[in-house]
Amino acid sequence: MKFFVDTADVAAIRELNDLGMVDGVTTNPSLILKSGRDILEVTKEICDIVEGPVSAEVVASKAGDMIREGEHLVKIAPNITVKVPLTWDGLRACKVLSSQGHKVNVTLCFSAAQAILAAKAGATFISPFIGRLDDINFDGMELIAQIREIYDNYDFQTQILAASIRSVNHITDAARIGADVITAPPAVIKAMANHVLTDKGLEQFNADWAKTGQKIV
């Protein structure tokens, strides 16, 4: 499974990347706003840090304008993936941009039917939003399972990029189902290292070591 980090926080990306935890990055207008920086400037800096795909999202609503924005975004760096919404215009833009050889991430997917359309339009990634489905009492993981089954049945090459990740369980459940990629906030990725029994065991080891009166260095 590939790990993408869902943030425009350059310091957080650099920290995880230095540990080999980052295979790519996803951004969106909300994350750019949170960063307080110019979209082109911060996206270029992220692309310089991370070798893998960096999703930069268009903001237009019409296909022609999305295509123009996408063609501008891909000039930032070779590893840019153009992110488009799962609307009819977004699918039209996806088809054109993918036909031009650009990577496309189709985002805001909430149904298997939408995922089929994205694959047919040539999407590199499909981003089903797990947490937002859970918020309205739908099973986000069931959607991942449905898309996995359909894509495997018909050998679609579009990668399932599980998004709207809210917890460590979301990550492990998506991994078990077979999502190709997860994108999660830095805090959730770092939380994967935490376990109460690890803390308890370390506390005991440290207490016992103190009783030996020894030093390693």
Swiss-Prot record:
Transferase is among the record's keywords: yes
Q: Which reaction does it catalyse?
A: D-sedoheptulose 7-phosphate + D-glyceraldehyde 3-phosphate = D-erythrose 4-phosphate + beta-D-fructose 6-phosphate
Q: Which residues form the active site?
A: K83 (schiff-base intermediate with substrate)
**What SUPFAM superfamilies does the database record attribute to this sequence?**
Aldolase
List its EC numbers: 2.2.1.2
**Record's keyword annotation contains Ion transport:** no
- Taxonomic superkingdom: Bacteria
Cellular component GO terms, alphabetical: cytoplasm
Q: Which pathway is it part of?
A: Carbohydrate degradation; pentose phosphate pathway; D-glyceraldehyde 3-phosphate and beta-D-fructose 6-phosphate from D-ribose 5-phosphate and D-xylulose 5-phosphate (non-oxidative stage): step 2/3
Which is an annotated GO molecular function term of this record?
transaldolase activity
Quick one: a GO biological-process term for this protein?
Answer: pentose-phosphate shunt
Q: What keywords would UniProt list here?
A: Cytoplasm, Pentose shunt, Schiff base, Transferase
Protein name (record): Probable transaldolase
